[in-house]
């Protein structure tokens, strides 16, 4: 299987499977001299790890990251400094239950990659989906922790803005609320609504989709390039690579189809300090594939988890019709834990474009 690497200068390769002994990543192209502690990476993995509420999978993984290479340890025994060589990181799997998947070893679960993997490779890891499992994204989040260190002054934050048909009230948006509830919601008022709604979904053994929004602030103007190296193009590509993501929009996104040119185009004026300012941000901080200096805004839609208790019609590897009922521990709404994953992907895209811009123009933005 190829295509396990993304990025041009900031390059990330992930490896490992859901029920293997471990998974991890190699970050190549990280500049030397970046100083950080293990906790600077672990904080993001803790945000993604399973078992933190009744609304996510009850698989228990500590997701403790180990840095194996690419750094030198300071005298304090905690602070690491990147050397410019590949940074390899490892996360052990400790709570696999492969026996839960024995009955589907030859059955194709509806909505999963079982059929397409078998069709393409002639073999698949049925234990939790193997490489196609969202478990792989733990390695991406670790890489995103490194990416956040690359571009000075950039803050990447994500939030859940919709579960099923229940959307947040954007007038209530408060970033301080995101870490105060199990949904990463910026709207405190929607939390009890989501709790009641997801409890019903969970008890029924079903699942539901969601929408995640990621905002990157402090992104320097000038990142990205036309025509085939657009910043929004690469952000969309990386977000689409996340398991269960079926749609991505930048800025106004699909709402632009309902908007007039007068309302959609972001007007400009000169600020009091003599620098240009935008009067709106419908473009999501990117014009012509190049960052404007405004916040970069991306949203992505996550489909309902395909692993549900409801019996579904399918076929098996022998070409027989079967009824499939998925066992194991699964997220009733995978969109919740997709928030830190989306953050990591956007951070990696921005870090890559920052290094590419620096290499092409020589500017330290």
Curated annotation (Swiss-Prot):
FMN binds at residues 131-133, 243-244, 288, 303-307, 329. One of its GO terms (molecular function) is FMN binding. InterPro entries: Chorismate_synth (IPR000453), Chorismate_synth_AroC_sf (IPR035904), Chorismate_synthase_CS (IPR020541). Reduced FMN (FMNH(2)). Its EC number is 4.2.3.5. Coiled coil: none annotated. Its cofactor is FMNH2. The keyword Amino-acid biosynthesis applies. One of its GO terms (biological process) is amino acid biosynthetic process. The keyword Ribosomal protein does not apply. Pathway: Metabolic intermediate biosynthesis; chorismate biosynthesis; chorismate from D-erythrose 4-phosphate and phosphoenolpyruvate: step 7/7. NCBIfam families: aroC, PRK05382.1. HAMAP family: Chorismate_synth. Belongs to the chorismate synthase family. This is Chorismate synthase.
